[in-house]
A protein has these predicted regions:
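Short, surface-exposed connector motifs at secondary-structure boundaries
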Residues: 11-15, 41-48, 101-102
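Short acidic/glycine-rich loop or secondary-structure boundary segments that cap or lie
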Residues: 1, 14, 25-26, 58-61
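Active-site beta-loop-alpha junctions of metal-dependent nucleic acid enzymes
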Residues: 16-41
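Short, surface-exposed basic-aromatic patches at helix termini and helix-loop junctions that form
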Residues: 62-75
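Short conserved beta-strand segments at catalytic cores or DNA/RNA-binding microdomains
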Residues: 1-15, 20, 31
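Short, well-ordered secondary-structure micro-motifs
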Residues: 60-63, 90
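Acidic/histidine-rich, metal-coordinating catalytic segments
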Residues: 31, 41-60, 82-83
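Charged alpha-helix within mobile-element recombinases
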Residues: 55, 72-77, 81-146
Length: 146
């Protein structure tokens, strides 16, 4: 099992999901699930673009872009250049925060869904210097109220 981590660009809000395998099918299936939970419009507004690394699990760009709910694209996919992690800097920082709880190379299967959601909650409520001590959770709530 592996983690799928989505980072919202403006607020750095994280969605962390455990998926069965590092496969194109599992990535698209989880994005479909997230889109259904959020609603097509909110997903499209939140994740206008998704920048992926070049892992084989991210190669189904049509599946990633295609909405599971409406007959239009849900997002636009871009790929970072090989060995250019800085092109996905916010996501890499989120991965660093996740590693406080789950060291790199750990068996993700040993972590419950509840534990993964607790980590997600901790990250989203962590005060950020970038936001003058405000959390991503607070900022995304403000964004959707406005």
């Amino acid at each position: 099992q592996v983690l799928l981590v989505l980072t919202e660009r403006k607020t750095r809000y994280e969605i962390v999901s455990k998926i069965k395998s590092k496969s194109q099918y599992c990535v698209v299936k989880e994005l479909d699930k997230i889109e259904r939970k959020m609603g097509a419009k909110k997903f499209r507004e939140t994740f206008k673009t998704i920048t992926c690394d070049n892992g084989c699990e991210n190669l189904d760009f049509e599946g990633i872009e295609r909405s599971a709910v409406v007959k239009r694209k849900r997002t636009k996919v871009f790929y970072a250049h090989p060995y250019s992690a800085w092109e996905r800097g916010s996501n890499e920082n989120a991965n660093k925060l996740i590693r406080r709880f789950i060291p790199k190379g750990s068996d993700i299967g040993k972590f419950s869904h509840e534990r993964i959601k607790m980590i997600e909650h901790w990250i989203n409520n962590y005060p950020r210097r970038l936001f003058n001590g405000l959390s991503s959770d607070l900022l995304i709530k403000r964004m959707y109220v406005a």
